[in-house]
C-alpha cells in the first residue's frame, strides 16, 4: 500500500472500509484540507463519523452503509448519496445545500477528493475521488481532500465501474470514521 505524507498534521484524517460485491476490499484513508476549506472539510468529516445524528431526511447523517453509485473508469468514483443511493439525494450537516467555499485547491490527479454538485453552490454530501487528472473541474467543484493511503483500493473500486458509471458489483462504504 502506498502512503502519501499528510500536508498538515492539524488536518483531520478519515477512513472508509470498502467492500466490493460484499467482499472486503480494504481501507481508504483521506486527509481533509480543513486549513483551506474548513466548512467543506467539516461536513465530510462529520459524515464520516456520523456524530450529527439524524438529518432532515429522517436518515442518519453518515456515509456508513452507503454506496459509490457512479464509478466511471479513467475518471472518478462518486458516492455520498446516503438518502436515495442513486445520485439524486444526500444531505449536508448544515441542513441544506451549502455554497462553494473556494476554489483554491485544484484537481491535480488521482486521489483528489472533491464535492459533487448540481451547479454552483449546491454542495450536499455527494463527493468523488478522482482516478485521473481532471483539471477541467477546477473552478466548478470544491477540492477538499486527498487519498493518503489505499489508492490501490480506489483502483479496485474503479475496476468495478464502467464508462456509463454503472457498477458491475456494489461498491459500499462498510464502515467509516476519523483517525
From Swiss-Prot:
One GO CC annotation: intracellular membrane-bounded organelle
Catalysed reactions listed for this entry: [protein]-peptidylproline (omega=180) = [protein]-peptidylproline (omega=0)
One Pfam short name: Pro_isomerase
Isomerase in keyword set: yes
Enzyme class: isomerase
Disruption phenotype: Grows and develops almost normally, except for the production of tall fruiting bodies.
Gene Ontology terms, MF aspect: cyclosporin A binding; peptidyl-prolyl cis-trans isomerase activity
Keywords on record: Cytoplasm, Isomerase, Rotamase
Location of the PPIase cyclophilin-type domain: 15-178
Function: PPIase that catalyzes the cis-trans isomerization of proline imidic peptide bonds in oligopeptides and may therefore assist protein folding.
PANTHER family (UniProt xref): PEPTIDYL-PROLYL CIS-TRANS ISOMERASE, PEPTIDYL-PROLYL CIS-TRANS ISOMERASE D-RELATED
Protein name per Swiss-Prot or TrEMBL: Peptidyl-prolyl cis-trans isomerase A
Species per Swiss-Prot/TrEMBL record: Dictyostelium discoideum (Social amoeba)
Name of the coding gene: ppiA
Amino acid at each position: 500500500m502506498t502512503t502519501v505524507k499528510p500536508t498538515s498534521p492539524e488536518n483531520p484524517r478519515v477512513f472508509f472500509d470498502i467492500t466490493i460485491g460484499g467482499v472486503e476490499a480494504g481501507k481508504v484513508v483521506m486527509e481533509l484540507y480543513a486549513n483551506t476549506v474548513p466548512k467543506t472539510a467539516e461536513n465530510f468529516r462529520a459524515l464520516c463519523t456520523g456524530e450529527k445524528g439524524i438529518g432532515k431526511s429522517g436518515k442518519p447523517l453518515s456515509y456508513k452503509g452507503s454506496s459509490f453509485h457512479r464509478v466511471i473508469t479513467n475518471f472518478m468514483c462518486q458516492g455520498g448519496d446516503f438518502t436515495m443511493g442513486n445520485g439524486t439525494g444526500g444531505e449536508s450537516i448544515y441542513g441544506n445545500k451549502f455554497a462553494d467555499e473556494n476554489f483554491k485547491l485544484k484537481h491535480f490527479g488521482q486521489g483528489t477528493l472533491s464535492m459533487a454538485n448540481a451547479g454552483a453552490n449546491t454542495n450536499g454530501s455527494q463527493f468523488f475521488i478522482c482516478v485521473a487528472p481532471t483539471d477541467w473541474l477546477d473552478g466548478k467543484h470544491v477540492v477538499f481532500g486527498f487519498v493518503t493511503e489505499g489508492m490501490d483500493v480506489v483502483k479496485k473500486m474503479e475496476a468495478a465501474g464502467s464508462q456509463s458509471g454503472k457498477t458491475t458489483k456494489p461498491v459500499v462504504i462498510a464502515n467509516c470514521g476519523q483517525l
